[in-house]
Each structure stands twice: as C-alpha cells, then as structure tokens.
Amino acid sequence: MGIEQLSCPACGATFEMGLPRDVTVQSVTTEDREEPDDDRVKVRPNACSNGHECYVMFRF
C-alpha cells in the first residue's frame, strides 16, 4: 500500500490517503458517490485537516 497526497476539492488543503499500489485516482469530490458496478473501480471516503468530507474514486 502506498500513501497518496491528494487535494481537498473544497479548500485545497493537502491530505494523505493509503491506497493500493498501481491504482489511478480518477476523482476527488465532495459529492457522495456510490460504489460503481465495475469491480476495478472503488470509492472511499476521507476528510481533509479542515474537516471537509470528500470521496476518492480510484481504478485498479
């Protein structure tokens, strides 16, 4: 597992998220996302240091 540096879409603050190696981050948004039908795409919640909840979508 690797640590990715991501930016909060609400305020631009940088936050870290542990993700499996060799994934591609597709989006970081404040809008709640449901799990896609594609087994190779996942959505995980996270929050920045300012408390903004965001959703990270990534593909294996």
Curated annotation (Swiss-Prot):
Keyword terms, alphabetized: Activator, Metal-binding, Transcription, Transcription regulation, Zinc, Zinc-finger
Bridged cysteine pairs (disulfide): none
Key word Lyase present: no
Superkingdom, natural source: Archaea
Keyword Zinc: yes
Annotated InterPro entries: Brz_Regulator
GO molecular function: zinc ion binding
Zinc finger (C4-type): 8-52
Purpose: Activates transcription of bacteriorhodopsin (bop) and phytoene synthase (crtB1). May interact with DNA or RNA via the zinc finger motif.
Family: Belongs to the Brz family.
Stored NCBIfam families: Brz
Protein name: Transcriptional regulator Brz
Organism from which the protein derives: Halorhabdus utahensis (strain DSM 12940 / JCM 11049 / AX-2)
Gene name in the database record: brz
